[in-house]
């Protein structure tokens, strides 16, 4: 009998009621008018008739019918009541023919609140029906509420182009990533085929994820779905059998665990930390190896490491530097390590072909040298589980892929010291600084440079430009301003063919044809911060050889591992011009030593941004995470962090994966 279903539903409702009461929480259905007292004064946008997810129905619009339901919409009134009779009648109607009329609901911050049809929602939840037809009106949050809920502001753009309500993500950037994975955007209406494919993929995933709830971390399904799409986008949009979806979801369980962890990235900040991870240190300081199996690599059976570049070594100084690092790695191990490189793998097809060749070659490790390759690297790591995959980036959280980067801000601080001395000596008190991409870690380098310059010239101003900005002609802009001290490209191997690299002094410059500055300018090189990728690769490979790569200290179970090494590990350093003053060299040497032994950081003491005070002298020091995530500029910097739309197409690819929040956020407003 249908009354039996009501009795069962009421039993569930009473259980929920008791649980909420015991927890000191409100035991009835939430009402929007109670949650948002000024709800009736908010701007209303009729969205019309649509199918909405029952799981996103959070309560009722008004306060009148709250006490009839528990918070989960299960009924509470006596089974002999008129309410129970009507509920059972609706149950029969749904079983036999379905509901004829849509409910009326208001949507606020991606949740629905019912004006008419509470019992129909209750019946739908009792029957575990995923969707229900509704006539929906959106209540537009106020500007301050939207500012506190950037993910919802982004969702509204997503809904406008996709007309999909089902996917509920909690973090900013998720909907932009979905659009990018779909090779679409949040500005133009999506084709019906794409819209239906994504919605179907989400429902296939959500059914499996709910069924595996006991084996999965408590991660919002929408957030988990984005991770799933990153890895399986090519097949996820097809109609896949449930067993295949289940197998794929289980294969990336660790990625879900990492996403759930509030401290998603675990930094390994010294080479010693990595190299002694598989050892015990006795009370006397003696290092004793743990029982970690060491692999026997020889010249006849070498460790094989593949390097995948998104660019060509002849076209990119960044790629050329990594290629030098690869060759240094081979040289350091004298035949015990063999390497191969694959250039020009920016497209998914060429990347996958490179990984396939590397796997057939027998690669033990694969290094991918651009943040833009992270998703391709992640997909490969899931497929080729016996190969260790590492990506050159910082603050990207994936269990299957380790990341590595250098603390370039340490060397930038030292070059800033020299720049300040030169700017004070020529009386201009001005320095030009050209950065590449506004990605994690880069802003710290800019600020450290500016702080170093201010320590030797308190009057100095640093003029910031971005090489990756569209139609940028930063060099001549600086020359026109009368700036002589410039921080240019970090590498000697300049893509533009000039000899303007590192920190330099422009003694004379006249406009000429082409980009070869050596023909039109007289430039004196002062110093250069340098990445020493060979040293970094040498240390990582050593951990693989001695077995410490998989030690618990480094191989965290619910965190991504990020090697972030500085001058003390030999991963970054500074080269000084021979004709620099001996006093300048001594100052740099002293502060370099203090950075290495940990007694000094460029970000000690009071810090002031363009907007005001960041840190007082007595505040806790900035954490490494704070330094990586910087999205502010020091007070003596003239310039800004560009929005993503102002960057070249090539730069936008990298910034979408690894850009600082300010860059991505402002472009979405």
Question: For each predicted feature, which ranges?
Answer:
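Short, charged/polar connector segments at secondary-structure boundaries
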Residues: 1-111, 115-116, 126, 171-183, ...
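A short, basic-hydrophobic beta/loop patch
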Residues: 97-113, 119-151
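Extracytoplasmic "Venus flytrap"
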Residues: 305-324, 329, 333, 342-348, ...
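Flexible loop/hinge segments that line or gate small-molecule binding clefts
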Residues: 382-405
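Hydrophobic alpha-helical segments within soluble ligand-binding/sensing domains
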Residues: 405-427, 531-550
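Segments of small-molecule ligand-sensing domains
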Residues: 546-669
């Amino acid at each position: 009998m249908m009354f039996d279903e009501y009795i069962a539903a009421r039993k569930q409702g009473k259980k929920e009621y008791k649980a909420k009461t015991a927890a000191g929480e409100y035991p009835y259905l939430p009402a929007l008018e109670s949650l948002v007292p000024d709800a009736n004064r908010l701007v209303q946008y009729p969205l019309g008739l649509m199918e909405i997810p029952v799981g996103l129905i959070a309560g009722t619009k008004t306060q009148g019918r709250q006490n009839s339901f528990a918070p989960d919409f299960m009924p509470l009134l006596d089974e002999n009541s008129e309410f129970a009779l009507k509920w059972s009648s609706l149950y029969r109607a749904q079983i036999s023919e379905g509901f004829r009329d849509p409910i009326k609901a208001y949507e606020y911050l991606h949740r629905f609140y019912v004006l008419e049809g509470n019992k129909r929602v209750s019946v739908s939840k009792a029957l575990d029906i995923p969707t229900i037809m509704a006539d929906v009106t959106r209540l537009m949050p106020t500007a301050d509420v939207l500012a506190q809920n950037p993910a919802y502001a982004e969702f509204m753009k997503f809904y406008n182009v996709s007309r999909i309500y089902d996917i509920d993500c909690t973090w900013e950037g998720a909907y932009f990533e979905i659009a990018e994975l779909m090779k679409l955007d949040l500005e133009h209406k999506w084709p019906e085929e794409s819209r239906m494919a994504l919605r179907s993929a989400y429902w296939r995933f959500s059914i499996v994820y709910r069924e595996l709830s006991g084996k999965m971390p408590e991660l919002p399904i929408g957030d988990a779905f984005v991770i799933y799409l990153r890895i399986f986008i090519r097949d996820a949009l097809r109609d896949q059998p449930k067993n295949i979806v289940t197998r794929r979801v289980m294969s990336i369980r660790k990625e879900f665990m990492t996403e759930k962890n509030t401290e998603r990235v675990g930094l390994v900040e010294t080479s010693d930390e990595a190299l002694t991870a598989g050892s015990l240190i006795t009370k006397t300081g003696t290092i004793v190896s743990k029982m970690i199996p060491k692999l026997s690599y020889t010249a006849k059976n070498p460790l094989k490491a593949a390097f995948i570049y998104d660019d060509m070594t002849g076209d990119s100084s960044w790629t050329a530097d990594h290629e030098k690092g690869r060759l240094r790695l081979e040289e350091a191990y004298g035949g015990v390590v063999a390497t191969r490189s694959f250039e020009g793998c920016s497209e998914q097809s060429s990347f996958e072909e490179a990984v396939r060749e590397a796997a057939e070659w027998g690669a033990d490790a694969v290094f991918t040298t651009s943040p833009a390759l992270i998703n391709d690297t992640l997909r490969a790591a899931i497929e080729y589980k016996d190969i260790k995959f590492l990506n050159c980036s910082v603050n990207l959280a994936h269990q299957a892929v380790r990341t590595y980067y250098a603390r370039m801000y340490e060397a930038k601080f030292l070059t800033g010291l020299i720049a300040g001395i030169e700017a004070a000596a020529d009386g201009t008190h001005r320095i030009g600084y050209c950065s590449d991409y506004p990605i994690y870690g880069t802003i710290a380098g800019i600020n450290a440079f500016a702080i170093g310059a201010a320590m030797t010239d308190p009057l100095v101003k640093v003029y910031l430009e971005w090489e990756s900005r569209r139609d940028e002609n930063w060099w001549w802009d600086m020359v026109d301003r009368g700036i002589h001290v410039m921080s240019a490209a970090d590498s000697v191997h300049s893509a533009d063919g000039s000899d303007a690299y590192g920190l330099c002094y422009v003694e004379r410059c006249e406009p000429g044809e082409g980009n070869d500055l050596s023909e039109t300018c007289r430039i004196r090189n002062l110093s250069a911060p340098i990445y020493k990728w060979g040293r970094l690769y040498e240390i990582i490979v050593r951990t693989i050889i001695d077995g410490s790569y998989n030690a618990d200290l480094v191989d965290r179970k619910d965190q991504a591992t990020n090697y972030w090494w500085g001058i003390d590990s030999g991963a970054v350093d500074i080269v000084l011009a021979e004709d620099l003053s001996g006093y300048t060299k001594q100052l740099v040497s002293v502060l370099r030593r203090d950075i290495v032994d940990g007694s000094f950081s460029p970000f000690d003491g009071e810090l002031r941004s363009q907007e005001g005070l960041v840190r007082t002298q007595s505040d806790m020091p900035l954490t490494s995470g704070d330094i990586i995530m910087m999205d502010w500029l020091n007070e003596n910097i003239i310039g800004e962090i560009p929005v993503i739309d102002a960057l070249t197409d090539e730069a936008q690819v990298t910034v979408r994966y690894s850009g600082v929040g300010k860059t991505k956020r402002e472009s979405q407003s």
